[in-house]
Amino acid sequence: MQQACIAIIIILLTVAAYLAMVKLYKRFPLPFLIPVLTTTILIVAALMMFHVSYEGYMIGGKWINSLLGPAVVALAYPLYKQWHIIVKHCVPILGGVLVGLCMGMISGLIFAEAFGIDHDLLLSILPKSITTPVAIQIAAGLGGVPSMTVVFVMIAGFSGVILGPLFLKWLRIRSSLGQGIALGSASHALGTSKALEYGELAVSMSSVSMTLCAVLGSFFGPLVVWLFHI
């Protein structure tokens, strides 16, 4: 009974924090005030301040986490509605995803080499632009550290969501197709949530890109390691 009450309180506080950050973002729509980022910082700060362990938070957090699956499945609806566009533009979509995936991996390697990062961490940073569950499996298969891969995936997601819109504006990419592919390829699920601001077509393209990156990344990860003799 006590754990049930704790779980309910944690769920309510988490949802309340997120809604408050959404309201803040609507009032001040700045790139670094995106609700996912500010809510994460707020929750981490609260856990540290009140000395609450990760396991303690996950008593309620696991129920919120369980909604991730249905949320991903729900992305099938905009895909269905935009299917004719996806079929029509399948070649540029696939080309954009391949370029985004390869650049994501190669940029990670360049960053790692520039800062002299250890070999294990280098392999962990490789799948940073792929959605977390798949990135963990790729990193483990390559000999990386899965826990560090999660950190790099989060960094890629947040940096893409914050800087992505600025680059899209700077490069004058106004096509929902291009915006969705860019956000989904670079920032996986977080990029897809950001694509909501660009419309239904952008969300569809972002979810397609995220899925294709996960599938193709399983093949290209080992290939990049082999090509660059890592």
From Swiss-Prot:
Domain of life: Bacteria
Family statement drawn from the similarity comment of this UniProt entry: Belongs to the YohK (E.coli)/YwbG (IPA-22R) (B.subtilis) family.
Membrane topology: Multi-pass membrane protein
Pfam families: LrgB
Keywords, comma-separated and alphabetical: Cell membrane, Membrane, Transmembrane, Transmembrane helix
Protein name: Uncharacterized protein YxaC
Localisation per UniProt entry: Cell membrane
Species the sequence originates in: Bacillus subtilis (strain 168)
Record-annotated membrane-spanning stretches: 4-24, 30-50, 67-87, 91-111, 148-168, 210-230
Entry's Gene Ontology cellular component terms: plasma membrane
